[in-house]
Amino acid sequence: VDRSDYSDARTYYHDASGKMDLMHLGAYFDPGMEFDLPEDLNNYNREQLEALFDRPFTGTGVRIIKSHIFANHIDHIKKLFSECPMILALRDDDACLGWWVRCGHFNITYPDYAEYYRDLKTMAKIIDWQNRDIRSAWDYYDGFVARDNQELAGILGIQTPPEEYAQNYAQSDLEVKVI
């Protein structure tokens, strides 16, 4: 896995779980974030998207591209990058908003959610919209449901994370599917 998008500035730790945990690691791509993405990705072809995704990377290998707005463009991304697995992460709308608030809401230092998500009302509306599209893709596409990040790494064929970063998705009120 190409981890060249890593920098200390692209990490976020918080104690929402009761202990200091790494919450974000590496580049994030969304409107208004450090690696800004246009809201309507459906107007972009594969080469244009690759150019956007390449910006934080200097290495080679498998790249993990993280974005919330991918939720609204799953069919388009699957069509353009059919050979690439896509990870769907789903948490109930209210639980999703509650977890985000608990983890620091607009005080999260990386990535910066403020420009695109603006306020809690807008954030709640966008979460509902994104989760609706994730649920639709979850039902439409065949795939593999992962119980934890160790199993997810196996499905993806990448190195398993160290034990100190083990995450049981059910205990985190999260569902994860690779399509």
Q: How should each PLM-predicted stretch be described?
A:
Residues 59-161:
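PAPS-dependent sulfotransferase catalytic domain
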Residues 55:
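Walker A/P-loop-proximal flanking segment of P-loop NTPase domains
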